[in-house]
Every structure is written in structure tokens, then in C-alpha cells.
Amino acid sequence: TPVSAVGSTDMHAQTQQHQDGKKDKVIQFVEILEREQQIVLNNSFTHISSLKKYDGLSVDHALKIALAANEEALNSDGRLNAKYILPRIDEYYLGQLLYFLMLSVAYEGELADVDAYDQPGVETYKQIMKQKMSHQ
């Protein structure tokens, strides 16, 4: 079941399950090599010496370090993971990634003997919903 996570906040919320839970998932990362805008951290807490090292650090660099650390932790425990590297976010590269992921869902459906296109398993809920909505 796909679950999305963006950045280190979402990643942190799910890392415990990924690292110590069942080994029944493939964790997928998307790394963007070139970004149009760079956000730079400004240290508002100059009186805290341990935070001085983060002044001037780009958010992009921090996210790449978080991705690499998470990837290394997963690998150290034999957890399946994949990293998709896009040169930049644009229609061409995003389209390629989405096409690849759509094909992988179709392929996985075939391997698991699940109809990924017709989705007959959804029909029961749709029929119940239709009946309930007609009684409103």
C-alpha cells in the first residue's frame, strides 16, 4: 500500500515502522539534483553555539543528508529500498517517473494476481455507497 512522505518531518514519522517493522515494504526515495530555488537556513538562535554550524545551510542539502542517512540505515538492516534520481523537476522527468510508477503498479498487480485496472474489489463499497446515498 503506497504511503507518501515528504521531507524529514514525514520521513521521521514513518521511519520507526520502516526500520523496525515487518520487512514487507520497499521504501522509495526521490532525489532532485537541481532545484530552481535554494532556501538557506538563517540561525535565529545565535546565542546557542551548537546551532551555529547550521547557519547558511541550504534546505536542499539538509534533505539530501536526511535521505542518505535514511537510505544507509535501511541498507544496514537489509531493508528493501529504491532511489529515483531526477535531474530536475519538470514535465519531462516527472512524466517519466510517473509513467514508470504506473507501469510498476500494473506489473505488481499481475505478480500478485490482482486486477489493477478493473478493480472488482472496489465494487462492493461502491454498491453500498450508492444504496446509502439514494436513501438521503
Sequence positions of predicted segments:
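A SIS-like phosphosugar-recognition module
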Residues: 1-136
